[in-house]
Amino acid sequence: MSIEVHAVSKSYGIQSALNEISFSAKKGEIIGFLGPNGAGKSTMMKILTGFILPSKGTVFVSGINVLKNPIEAKTHIGYLPEQNPLYEDMYVKEYLQFQASIFKVSKEVTTTVIKTVGLMPEVHKKIGQLSKGYQQRVGIAAAIIHNPDVLVLDEPTTGLDPNQIQEIRTLIKELGKEKTILFSTHIMQEVEAVCDRVIIMKKGELLIDKPINELKKSNEQIIEVTFDYKIEEQFIQRLPNMITFKNNFDNTWYITFDSTED
């Protein structure tokens, strides 16, 4: 597996950002990380890429323990954070050659990557002169400059116009033919357009992990219920058409029902 996440939790004091998250991904999969703001998507991505540590759990990328060998693991990871960290006063080619030098990549590879992401027409411009869509392409180019096995993209289409969104989606699908891609968004239509599989999160919990085609066929419905008082599991188990349930915290439950019958 390219990505293996085992029982990862992250807390900030008494606030839980992630609760026992586990999933895996194989080469060539594009996985959509779907959820509202505050679901824990960015936190999980920062842990996966070695930028923050989990409170507990383990993470492996290309068989390397990210927590024990973060520097080695990062050579296998390309990461585009939500806030694209670009040097706007640098020229496109200059910036990407600088990124390549960090990984000791040749100038020839830099040119190939520039062509791959469609930056040739803009290569002699300063990054600050580019549109948001082309700036995202620069960020993606920097993320793949060292030919990583895993590409982590945190909301890469946010703030783009419809044409730019379509262009970035097409680029991601092309890159996904050879790499494992984890792609976060809060728009379901985007997941359907780009991804093979979806992981749905809410309030630090993993609610669904399914292939897109299975999710479309599914008659399951998940609801979040907060009771006024403590409820025993036996009560939940007796609910009609109940498939699964999970106690999130206190008196709040996530309950999955078969919605074939009203």
Residue ranges and their predicted role:
Residues 2-3, 10-202, 206-208:
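ABC transporter nucleotide-binding domains
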Residues 167-258:
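ABC transporter nucleotide-binding domain
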Residues 260-262:
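Short, charged/polar, Gly/Pro-enriched secondary-structure boundary elements
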